[in-house]
Amino acid sequence: MEVNVINIESQNIGKIDLNPLIFSVNYRPDILKMVVEWQLSKRRIGAHKTKTIGDVSGTTAKPYRQKHTGRARQGSLRSPQFRGGAVIFGPVVRTHAYSLNKKVRNLGLKVALSLKNSCNKLLILDSIDVNFVKTAQVLRFIKNFEHQSFLIIGKDYNKGMMYSCKNLHNVTLLKQIGTNVFDILRHDCVILTVDTVKYLEDRLL
């Protein structure tokens, strides 16, 4: 499958073959859901915690005598049934991350890239190494395409490209080693460099 390769001036400078095993995979929303949930679970801090009876401060004295009061026996005012007492079965500090099969993760990436390609929201750029710092130049480039947000993925980017995109809220730069399903789906248009296409073919095949 041949697609055009463009430069930062939005000019066609050649063509590149995209492997259909990566860029023309059947749409699988179930796989995308699994991978996105896996990614988001790894981002959670898991710092939530409530106090157990060992954490609650307060007296250790028995509230009242064991017998002959007509009330239920109690041994501590820090028990869960009292106001200001402990919380039973409350959240504890833990990690929410879990493992996901590598084949599923790779398939999710293929499905996400294929989805963008099928919607004509995938562009191939020759390079993102520029020798200037001009936000206006990048702005002119993205205005040629009717998309809301852009994810630019490259092997690496220099300071010129980084500072040119820094003030654009709808443009995100990402190194190819960090290519992931969540970022691809949350941006309207994905721009890959030629080096990134080769990297993804080596990584996913």
Curated annotation (Swiss-Prot):
Superkingdom per UniProt: Bacteria
GO molecular function term, any single one: rRNA binding
Gene Ontology BP terms: translation
PANTHER family linked to this entry: 50S RIBOSOMAL PROTEIN L4, LARGE RIBOSOMAL SUBUNIT PROTEIN UL4M
Quaternary organization: Part of the 50S ribosomal subunit.
Family of this protein: Belongs to the universal ribosomal protein uL4 family.
Protein name: Large ribosomal subunit protein uL4
Source organism of the structure: Ehrlichia ruminantium (strain Welgevonden)
